[in-house]
Amino acid sequence: ACRCKKGERMPLTIAGSDPRKKGTITLVVQEVGLSSTRLCELNEGDYITDVVGPLGQATHIEKFGTVVCAGGGVGVAPMLPIVQALKAAGNRVITVLAGRNKDLIILEKEMRESSDEVIIMTDDGSYGRKGLVTEGVEEVIKREKVDKMLRYRSCHHDEVRLLAD
């Protein structure tokens, strides 16, 4: 989480870090309100008043076999280091990325570099296949054995419920 000067505290997801560059992290921010807009206006070397984290639980990584990682929107950001770690552990990684349209598909290049297969789904069909993230996941489950399934949001509420079923 970070606090921009005269802005609210907002949770942010670390999409990567570089241990060779002390203190360097990669954040993904969707510009939707005052604080996120101010954050997006910062330049390299600018100051952020307060940064707290990382927060939460680390994802357990081991060699599972075939792993499907599915997410949409900014929910894809926390998936990236996990996909990279799963691949490094020797898994076959299939990534399903989703967004409302082509412009909202993020980190595709980076996901392709660490995945055996990437399936793109867009609500409007402007890129990849038209449909929800769940349809991409169902395609994989129908054709092959999946040993582990990981899902990340933000995606539609109904998609999260379907992925949980």
Segments and roles (model prediction):
Residues 34-165:
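FNR/FR-type flavoprotein reductase catalytic core
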